[in-house]
């Protein structure tokens, strides 16, 4: 996971390498670093996706990673959710919850990389939740989502992330890597 600011944008990245263990963690970390550095250098999203995809395709292992990116325009409040094989994200606005999902494949899975982009105009107080598949498995009806929607998790981003992780680990049969990132919009 990375967050960074570049000129007029704030970025949040969550990459989740396919599989488990050290190799998957390394693929995730390398992909996030590629995205961060290339975007910071001014490369277009398409160029960065193509570069990371080519890099992963040319590794000796079958490497691929999901990409869940939030690109928030600091000038106009528009937020692009860019997804490649990523789990659904949530936007919490007051008592409303919006799910942003994708059917695209992970980066490094095929020769051509495809992504889906959803643009949302955010408001102060909105919260964005990005999660990995270790948390999202069976998102509908999951205990952490029920706890979140019933208001039984702490409202601050750090507390909410900790509560989601704790609830997601409850009753887990086989541990999978689990990542959650909660962002709150303070002003637009």
Regions found by a protein language model. Name each.
Residues 25-94, 168-176, 183:
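Catalytic core of PPM/PP2C metal-dependent serine/threonine phosphatase domains
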Residues 19-41, 126-175, 188:
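Active-site-proximal, acidic helix/loop segment immediately C-terminal to a metal-coordinating Asp/Glu
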Residues 12-13, 81:
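Short glycine-aspartate micro-motif
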Residues 1-10, 64-67, 99-141, 173:
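Acidic loop->beta-strand submotif enriched in PP2C/PPM serine/threonine phosphatases
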Residues 6-8, 74-76, 188:
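Short strand-connecting beta-turns/loops that link adjacent beta-strands
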Residues 22-26, 91-94, 109-114, 140-142:
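A short, polar/proline- and glycine-enriched secondary-structure boundary/capping micro-motif
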């Amino acid at each position: 996971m990375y967050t960074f600011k570049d000129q007029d944008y704030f970025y949040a990245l969550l990459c989740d390498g396919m599989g488990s263990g050290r190799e998957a963690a390394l693929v995730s970390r390398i992909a996030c670093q590629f995205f961060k550095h290339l975007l910071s250098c001014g490369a277009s999203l398409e160029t960065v996706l193509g570069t990371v995809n080519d890099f992963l395709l040319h590794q000796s292992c079958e490497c691929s990673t999901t990409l869940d990116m939030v690109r928030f325009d600091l000038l106009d409040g528009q937020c692009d959710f860019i997804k490649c094989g990523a789990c659904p994200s949530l936007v919490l606005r007051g008592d409303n919850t919006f799910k942003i999902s994708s059917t695209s494949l992970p980066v490094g899975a095929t020769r051509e990389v495809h992504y889906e982009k959803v643009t949302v105009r955010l408001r102060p107080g909105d919260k964005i939740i990005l999660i990995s598949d270790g948390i999202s498995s069976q998102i509908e009806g999951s205990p952490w989502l029920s706890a979140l929607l019933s208001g039984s998790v702490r409202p601050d981003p750090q507390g909410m992330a900790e509560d989601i992780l704790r609830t997601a680990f409850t009753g887990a049969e086989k541990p999978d890597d689990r990542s959650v990132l909660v962002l709150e919009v303070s002003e637009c």
